[in-house]
Curated annotation (Swiss-Prot):
Keyword Kinase belongs to the record: no
Family that this chain belongs to: Belongs to the complex I 23 kDa subunit family.
Protein name: NAD(P)H-quinone oxidoreductase subunit I, chloroplastic
Topology in membrane: Peripheral membrane protein
Catalytic activity: a plastoquinone + NADH + (n+1) H(+)(in) = a plastoquinol + NAD(+) + n H(+)(out); a plastoquinone + NADPH + (n+1) H(+)(in) = a plastoquinol + NADP(+) + n H(+)(out)
HAMAP family tied to this protein: NDH1_NuoI
Cofactor(s), names only, from the UniProt record: [4Fe-4S] cluster
Gene that encodes it: ndhI
EC number: 7.1.1.-
Binding note for cofactor: Binds 2 [4Fe-4S] clusters per subunit.
Alphabetical GO biological process terms: photosynthesis, light reaction
């Protein structure tokens, strides 16, 4: 009889513990139900990228000294730098500069190690094209100023996903 009572006590303890685990699962589910959805309606809603977002690379032709540091630090030797040595000035003269964004991994090494800061990362992430050869940007395309998501009047800006942190997420542009 004593063994039977012990079995009933153990069973009831395990049943209460199982109910607690199920209750914890429901609490997590209800917590996630109260949050904003993660999915955004992309063409009409856009996320404002974070402050350190690594998007398209912006290039300033006048600042470049054709030192080719960007090519040496690139893990895939991507930037193509064409220059010509001018004997009278004893200096390199930059002819063309290009980056193929179809191959670029957006690591940011070229931007970080550039001695003249002629390269910078922008917040532009819409680089989709039908032909991959259009992703090969020359110095004119790289010099184009980026379009800011915040200035697009046709788009409802999303300040953040709101999924991981609770509360309101402020964009870096408004602070």
């Amino acid at each position: 009889m004593f063994n039977f009572i012990n079995n009933i006590q153990n069973y009831s303890k395990e049943a209460v513990q199982a109910a607690q685990y199920i209750g914890q699962g429901f609490m997590v589910t209800f917590d996630h139900m109260s949050r904003r959805p993660v999915t955004i309606q992309y063409p009409y809603e856009k996320l404002i990228p974070s402050e350190r977002f690594r998007g398209r690379i912006h290039f300033e032709f006048d600042k470049c000294i054709a030192c080719e540091v960007c090519v040496r630090v690139c893990p895939i030797n991507l930037p193509v730098v064409n220059w010509e040595f001018q004997k009278e000035k004893k200096k390199k003269q930059l002819q063309t500069y290009s980056i193929d964004f179809g191959v670029c991994i957006f690591c940011g090494n070229c931007v970080e190690y550039c001695p003249t800061n002629c390269l910078s990362m922008t917040e532009e992430y819409e680089l989709s094209v039908y032909d991959r050869h259009e992703l090969n940007f020359d110095n004119f395309a790289l010099g184009r100023l980026p379009s800011m998501v915040e200035n697009d009047a046709m788009v409802k800006n999303m300040k953040g996903l709101g999924y991981l942190p609770k509360g309101v997420i402020e964009s870096h542009a408004s602070s």
